[in-house]
Design a protein with these regions (language model features):
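CN hydrolase (nitrilase-like) catalytic-core segments centered on the catalytic cysteine
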Residues: 1-72
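A short C-terminal boundary segment appended to hydrolase-like catalytic domains
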Residues: 46-141
Length: 141
């Protein structure tokens, strides 16, 4: 549960037939079974999980700017997307600065702080996020 909440990769090795490699969004990428008892997969530890709010156009913009150099996986049921550079010369920090998006962890923390103030009877502070004035639920050019 901790790994899912904090968006970590999980690589398990068990004696039964269900060893797994799980991505930061909880999806099984590889799994052993009765016939396949060894699995492997490259894992890029420079990745970012982001929330779609205010970022609907970001995956398309990244893929257009860096074709074949950055992998973006979409998990719309969870309102998340995963960004992983394939090219070693590109970092997620660079992509976040260039396209103005924050990690899901930053997004959720901003909301926790706002909710805390509301519960204390105070107005939430103005949101200062990487997205600026982008629309919450729409793609932009």
């Amino acid at each position: 549960m901790y790994a899912f909440l904090h968006h970590y990769y999980v690589v398990s090795s068990v004696r039964s037939d269900k060893s797994r490699i799980i991505d930061p969004c909880g999806r099984i990428l590889a799994q052993t079974d009765w016939w396949v008892n060894v699995i492997y997969r490259d894992i890029n530890l420079d990745y970012v999980v982001a929330h779609y709010d205010f970022n609907y156009s970001i995956p398309d913009k990244i893929l257009k700017a860096y074709p074949g150099r950055v992998k973006v996986k979409s998990y719309t049921d969870d309102s998340l997307f995963l960004v992983e550079p394939i090219d070693d010369s590109i970092t997620t920090k660079q992509l976040q600065e260039e396209f103005g998006f924050e990690s899901a962890a930053q997004y959720f923390q901003r909301h926790r702080e706002a909710y805390k103030r509301i519960l204390e009877g105070k107005p939430p502070l103005p949101q200062k996020a990487a997205h600026g004035d982008r629309p919450q639920y729409a793609k932009t050019d």
